[in-house]
Design a protein with these regions (language model features):
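Acidic/histidine-rich catalytic neighborhood of metal-dependent amide-processing enzymes
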Residues: 1-74, 80, 104-107
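Active-site-adjacent substrate-binding region
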Residues: 48-163
Length: 163
């Protein structure tokens, strides 16, 4: 068994200040890390889904009813098993991204990307936030807009996948 850290980062919207500091500190200390998992917006579903590249619609569909697992190359090796476990609880799609996600900047917009930049394996679990949720970062982003049964499925899937 390995130690598990639960870390809540601050200032993601200001340049991922907290996660960048921890990733750099771990790298400087030559600290090994099996996997960093960033939980980024997990409870919104929609009959429509946006994408950073139109071609992604053909692969991932046009309904925002899934959770996405976005991983760099090293973490991508874990994707099949994680996706199977998550998929038993909630529709799950995977997006392995090469080169730290630089070709698709929108996949770098959370606290996992500083870990990618430091050479760590990292995974973002997301409902795709603003690509489907019109309430994202708005006053209307309230619990009433969330799909709580979907969120429960995400939590159950994470417990199975990472447990």
């Amino acid at each position: 068994r390995r130690p598990v850290w639960l870390v809540a980062f601050d200032q993601e919207e200001w340049g991922m200040v907290g996660s960048a500091a921890l990733a750099a500190q771990l790298k400087q200390a030559d600290q090994a890390l099996k996997l960093m998992v960033s939980l980024e917006m997990l409870a919104y579903t929609s009959p429509s889904q946006g994408y950073p590249h139109p071609a992604m619609r053909a692969v991932y569909g046009d309904r925002g009813n899934f959770i996405a697992l976005v991983a760099n190359a090293g973490a991508g090796l874990l994707l099949p098993g994680l996706a199977r476990a998550m998929g038993r609880h909630v529709p799950t799609k995977v997006l392995p991204v090469p080169n730290g996600g630089r070709a698709i900047p929108d996949v770098r917009l959370s606290d996992h990307s500083p870990f990618w930049d430091q050479g760590y394996d990292a995974l973002m679990v997301t409902d795709t936030s603003f690509m489907r949720n019109p309430h994202y970062h708005q006053m209307t982003d309230t619990v009433e807009t969330l799909d709580l049964p979907f969120f429960c499925g995400v939590v159950e899937g994470l417990a199975e996948a990472l447990g």
